């Protein structure tokens, strides 16, 4: 396979994995208090640029197939895209890169949760709940994903 095909394939696998993990773990992936385990994949833009659109597509698929309202589909996907772009831009600054999904999803998805699902819960609390779940996925699980992917021989990743 040529490089373009490999890149496209890696992106498709990342998108599918994100959507599948989110849907399989739906009870904890959606709602006021959520830990979206698939968000551990948000470390991948550090290693590969194709992960940026792949994560956004995976999030879009998970939110559409998960039955989310349009407001959540649009702004949840936007939060993931912005976080992935910033993670990629900050790839040489690991701590800052890992914090981007926590920041963007905490603010944007926290607002979505408040306005779409839980208007009785104060907005700052919704943001805090989402950021806490993101922290578990991105700051605890993300480095494990990063370490595992780094162990894959480079010729297998970038053939």
Residue ranges and their predicted role:
Residues 1-53:
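Hydrophobic transmembrane alpha-helices
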